[in-house]
Amino acid sequence: NLYRRYGKNYLDRAAEMTIKRMDKWGLNTLANRSDKTIYDKNRKAFILPLENIGFENELMGLMDVYDNGIEKKMDEAIARNVAKYKNNHWLIGYFIGNEPAWISKENRLCSLILNGKDRPIKTELQNFLKESGDTPDTRKTFIYKTFEKLMKAISKSLKKNDPNHLNLGIRYGYIEQLDDELLRISKESFDALSFNCYALSPDHEKMNHALEISGLPMIIGE
């Protein structure tokens, strides 16, 4: 349809039309995962997602941070992500992930790891449970410890490869999921607390509590 409307240069002309509409509607920021043809016009502020940096479906959105080679691979992937935009003044920052699937399912994730292939995170978990006991609470503690280690590694890499822009967090699925420990980890790792909201409005009481614990500005991703 765009080709039929605009002809061969339809991408550029459609991008121009989008910017005109945003101006008319009073919108000043492009949404996450908008078309890069529009980003590259450099006429509206925008946000980028970090892509393909190593999150694993097998680990419900974590990485095996106990693998000696994983941080190097992740760092190289982040460097590739930010190379084009690290000096772009229109970029606000990066979402480093989206809706971690393991939150509130830490026990299940530990079972997946223990029943899965031999790998460093499995060995680390086995040793941790042997020392601390195998309970739902100790399993949750291990996953939180792993998540914190991963978030700090990503934050360090992002600041090294692009010190000019913000780490906008991991777009938690629901602010209601976030206990005080996750808020503390977020405070130590992110420049903003991002979450998605599928209700008509977010829970203001939960937002106030999140602000009290994390001290971070908040952004609703979707």
Give residue ranges: language-model regions:
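Short, hinge-like loop/turn segments at secondary-structure boundaries
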Residues: 48-49, 64-65, 184-187
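Loop/turn elements at helix/coil->beta-strand transitions in domains of secreted/extracellular proteins
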Residues: 23-29, 42-47, 87-93, 162-167, ...
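Short, compositionally biased "basic patch" segments
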Residues: 1, 121-130, 146-150, 155
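Aromatic- and acidic-residue-enriched segments that line the glycan-binding/catalytic groove
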Residues: 40-54, 89, 96-132
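Glycoside hydrolase catalytic-domain groove-lining segments
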Residues: 141, 145-156, 160-222
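Flexible loop/turn segments at secondary-structure boundaries
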Residues: 37-39, 55, 100-104, 174-178, ...
